Amino acid sequence: MAKLLAMILAGGEGRRLDPLTRDRAKPAVPFGGRYRIVDFVLSNMANSGILKMKVVVQYKSESLNTHVQRAWRLTSLLNQYVELVPAQMRVGPKWFEGSADAIYQNLNIITDEEPDFTFVFGADHVYRMDARQMLEFHLDRKAELTVAAVPIPVQEASEFGIIEVDADGRMIGFVEKPQSAPKTIPGDPTRCLASMGNYLFSTDALVQEIVRDAGDPSSAHDFGKSIVASMYQRKRVYVYDFARNVVPGQTERERGYWRDVGSIDAYFQANMDLVAVDPVFSLYNDEWPIFTVQYNYPPAKFVFNNEHDHRVGRATDSLVSEGCIISGSHVHHSILSPKVRVNSYATVDESIVFENVNIGRHCRIRRAIIDKHVDIPAHTTIGYDHEKDRKHFHVTESGIVIIPKGMRIEAGR
């Protein structure tokens, strides 16, 4: 049986997710109520039976470190592990200078473990994937590198590495974040083939390429710009079509679902994808669960049913986590993390509320993301007057209001 190792790159700063990333790395941002973004890649690896994982961290990693240590305890008796790898300056007094450099500075891990194949996956995407099917493709093609790819609308091409392939799936072109007209999928001028940032290497090839790249002073030391863009011209680089990946328990509608949640708008929409009656991505797949830390909180509680004065505790088309209390208020099309309290006569609509938030009586909240440890005073209105909101909060061009972690909001704002 082949020896496998997963290197999970979780050191991303996530500037486009500011202010959600002011105090945490992007993979540590909460998602779907009770998860962190990093849980999706780790769950995919665990469900695929790849049980040796190194999580490479750097930027504001305390929250991420704490989460991984609490949630991801595999059994050492079977040599299974999820281990954190902080920046250690092993090759000199410098931090990681790119995703490829993060691997170079930790090559000792790979050479010590001696895997036959090494997965190098990002930690900031939402999806389900059986990574062993990618391995089967890699072996079948006798590839040295396999890149997972997904079709995207052509107008989004400037945000991704865009790939061109031949009829056998071999990479024949690659441009990182093209600023001019990108290559489209043959027969489909509306879509491009984008790299998912997930790579599978034959380990010998990985070590050779990483060492070669480290010795190039002109390199950006980035997997897309530097490794893939160079390697496909010289070696056997193939592209795995993620749309072919079949996950147990997944509906046909969910197949191929993958979201880069690197911007506020993309993050918000991916969360909203979860609350539909028939969602395009369901958290309720027992055959391929998303694992996370288990809280010792009581069940969610809904209280008051006074229809005559509109004091009814209810939630519709929403995800409400453990420890929440919906007290005579209405939550609609929203996601609540643990220990959120929504008090009487308040309404929360199309919003994402992080842990330990209190929403006062008669508040009206719409299209907002509220970070942890925020107390919203009674009668506060958010999301209904963007000009007023911009004086106090961050508001995106699409009208999403973000309230940073621990922000103090004055009564009567």
From Swiss-Prot:
It catalyses: alpha-D-glucose 1-phosphate + ATP + H(+) = ADP-alpha-D-glucose + diphosphate. One of its GO terms (biological process) is glycogen biosynthetic process. SUPFAM superfamilies: Nucleotide-diphospho-sugar transferases (SSF53448), Trimeric LpxA-like enzymes (SSF51161). Pathway: Glycan biosynthesis; glycogen biosynthesis. Its EC number is 2.7.7.27. Alpha-D-glucose 1-phosphate binds at G161, E176, K177, S195. PROSITE patterns: ADP_GLC_PYROPHOSPH_2 (PS00809). GO terms for molecular function: ATP binding; glucose-1-phosphate adenylyltransferase activity. Keywords: ATP-binding, Carbohydrate metabolism, Glycogen biosynthesis, Glycogen metabolism, Nucleotide-binding, Nucleotidyltransferase, Transferase. The keyword Mitochondrion does not apply. It is an enzyme of class 2 (transferase). Signal peptide: none annotated. Pfam families: Hexapep_GlmU, NTP_transferase. Involved in the biosynthesis of ADP-glucose, a building block required for the elongation reactions to produce glycogen. Catalyzes the reaction between ATP and alpha-D-glucose 1-phosphate (G1P) to produce pyrophosphate and ADP-Glc. NCBIfam families: glgC (TIGR02091), PRK00725.1 (NF001947), PRK00844.1 (NF002023). Homotetramer. Belongs to the bacterial/plant glucose-1-phosphate adenylyltransferase family. This is Glucose-1-phosphate adenylyltransferase. It comes from Anaeromyxobacter sp. (strain K). The lineage of its organism: Bacteria, Pseudomonadati, Myxococcota, Myxococcia, Myxococcales. The gene is glgC.
